[in-house]
């Protein structure tokens, strides 16, 4: 019985860690793409680009905070 409980808890922990790593990689990839988009469009609509990127960043931070509260 103890082996089964340990295996179940360990499997759940591994699942949470892999989900957390996957989400962090998505957030990092989206932040890198947003930074590249901001550099390319800096001359034309910098205020709108900044606002859009800032809004995306805030949403990503909220998602990360929510997921951390669930996973930790």
Curated annotation (Swiss-Prot):
Sites bearing Asparagine amide, chain numbering: 72
Chief location of this protein within or outside the cell = secreted
Name the chain's protein.
Answer: VIP peptides
Family according to the record:
Belongs to the glucagon family.
Q: Which residues carry this modification: Isoleucine amide?
A: 27
Species in which this protein is naturally found: Oryctolagus cuniculus
User: Which compartments is it annotated to reside in?
Assistant: Secreted
Q: What else is known?
A: X's at positions 28 to 44 were included by homology with the human precursor sequence.
InterPro entries, A to Z: Glucagon_GIP_secretin_VIP, VIP/GHRH-like
Could you tell me one molecular function GO term of this UniProt entry?
A: peptide hormone receptor binding
Its biological purpose is as follows: PHM-27 is a bioactive form from proteolysis of the same precursor protein, that causes vasodilation. It is a potent agonist of the calcitonin receptor CALCR, with similar efficacy as calcitonin.
Q: Which UniProt keywords apply?
A: Amidation, Cleavage on pair of basic residues, Hormone, Secreted
BP terms from Gene Ontology: adenylate cyclase-activating G protein-coupled receptor signaling pathway; epinephrine secretion; mRNA stabilization; positive regulation of protein catabolic process; prolactin secretion; regulation of protein localization
Q: Name one GO cellular component term.
A: neuron projection
This protein's source sits in the domain of life called Eukaryota
Q: What is the lineage of its organism?
A: Eukaryota, Metazoa, Chordata, Craniata, Vertebrata
């Amino acid at each position: 019985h103890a082996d089964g409980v340990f295996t179940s808890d360990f499997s759940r922990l591994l699942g949470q860690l892999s989900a957390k790593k996957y989400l962090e990689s998505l957030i990092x990839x989206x932040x890198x793409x947003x930074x590249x988009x901001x550099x390319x469009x800096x001359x034309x609509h910098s205020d709108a680009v900044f606002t859009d990127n800032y809004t995306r960043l805030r949403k990503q931070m909220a998602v990360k905070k929510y997921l951390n509260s669930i996973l930790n």
